[in-house]
């Protein structure tokens, strides 16, 4: 699943994976579960880490951890994003993603389109 950032935010209307900042005392897995509840109204079952990435934008550095996960409960809703989509790895080139996701997208393509 990918989410389109709201137009008024930095990197507005670009696509990304759902997520957000880890709060004090949280693990990365707990943060992902919380963010998905807040942003999509779903509960996740979080699996293994797919990959970690550090990306430097001119205005900030982001540390991304992409997990394998499934929706355990709920139907995704657009609570904070402009749009949400389920896509396959073949559809990745049809979307404009945040630059921080480029390395992750390459790995997804290499892993699932062999």
What are these regions (language model features)?
Residues 7, 22, 54:
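Short, glycine/serine-rich, charged loops/turns that create anion-binding
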Residues 17-49, 88:
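The catalytic Nudix box helix
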Residues 109-114:
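Generic C-terminal helix-cap and adjacent flexible tail
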Residues 1-16, 44:
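N-terminal strand-loop-strand
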Residues 3-6, 20, 70, 87-89:
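Generic beta-structure capping elements
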Residues 68, 77-108:
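NUDIX/MutT-family hydrolases
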Residues 43, 51-75, 85, 108:
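Active-site-adjacent beta-strand/loop module that shapes the phosphate/pyrophosphate-binding cleft
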Residues 2, 48-51:
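A structural microfeature
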């Amino acid at each position: 699943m990918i989410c389109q950032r709201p137009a008024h935010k930095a990197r507005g209307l670009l696509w990304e994976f759902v997520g957000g900042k880890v709060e004090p005392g949280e693990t990365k897995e707990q943060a992902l579960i919380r963010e998905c509840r807040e942003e999509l109204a779903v509960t996740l079952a979080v699996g293994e880490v797919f990959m970690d990435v550090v990306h430097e934008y001119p205005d900030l550095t982001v540390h991304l951890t992409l997990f394998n996960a499934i929706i355990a409960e709920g139907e995704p809703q657009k609570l904070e994003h402009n749009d949400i989509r389920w896509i396959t790895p073949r559809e990745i080139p049809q979307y404009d993603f945040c630059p921080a996701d480029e390395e992750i997208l390459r790995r997804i393509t290499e892993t699932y389109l062999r």
